């Protein structure tokens, strides 16, 4: 019996000491990075798009030379270009609702996160026609000054 107690004591001591050896995240670094993007953050972005007003999503996009692919045209080379092009397209809609589905996959590595999901679209065109579909969504976020911004995005509709 005493050998068991001694063995148990040594095991508990080893476990306790090993917890001190584990690297700790700096509280300052963790706070400056904010929370990594998750499904809720992605939905917040799409809720902004549901307003059909680019001013409500601008805060999520990095400025400067970044590539964004949307349903049309082929590509945009910056947020400024994207905003101008999408604003013209959004004028054709009365309302929109975009829901990020449960198939979200997110991967985090330092100041970068990338993810994929499908997004349910339910929109009403200016002529009253209802448009419904499921879109593919790929996004790359970069942590810039503590804020996770989109530096690359791809939205597409599967071919029928």
Where are these regions (language model features)?
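Short, low-complexity N-terminal intrinsically disordered segments enriched in polar/charged residues
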Residues: 21-63
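A solvent-exposed, acidic/Ser-Thr-rich amphipathic alpha-helical stretch
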Residues: 36, 54-109, 132
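Beta-strand elements of well-folded, non-transmembrane domains
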Residues: 121-125, 141
């Amino acid at each position: 019996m005493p050998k068991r107690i001694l063995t148990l004591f040594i095991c508990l001591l080893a476990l306790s000491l090993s917890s001190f050896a584990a690297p700790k995240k700096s509280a300052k670094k963790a706070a400056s990075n904010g929370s990594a993007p998750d499904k809720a953050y992605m939905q917040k972005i799409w809720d902004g798009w549901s307003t059909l007003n680019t001013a409500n999503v601008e805060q999520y996009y990095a400025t400067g030379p970044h590539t964004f692919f949307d349903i049309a045209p082929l590509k945009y080379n910056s947020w400024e270009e994207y905003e101008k092009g999408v604003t013209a397209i959004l004028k054709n809609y009365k309302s929109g609702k975009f829901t990020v589905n449960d198939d979200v996959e997110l991967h985090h590595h330092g100041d970068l996160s990338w993810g994929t999901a499908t997004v349910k679209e339910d929109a009403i065109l200016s002529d009253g026609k209802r448009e419904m579909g499921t879109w593919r969504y790929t996004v790359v976020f970069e942590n810039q000054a503590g804020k996770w911004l989109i530096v690359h995005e791809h939205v597409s509709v599967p071919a029928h």
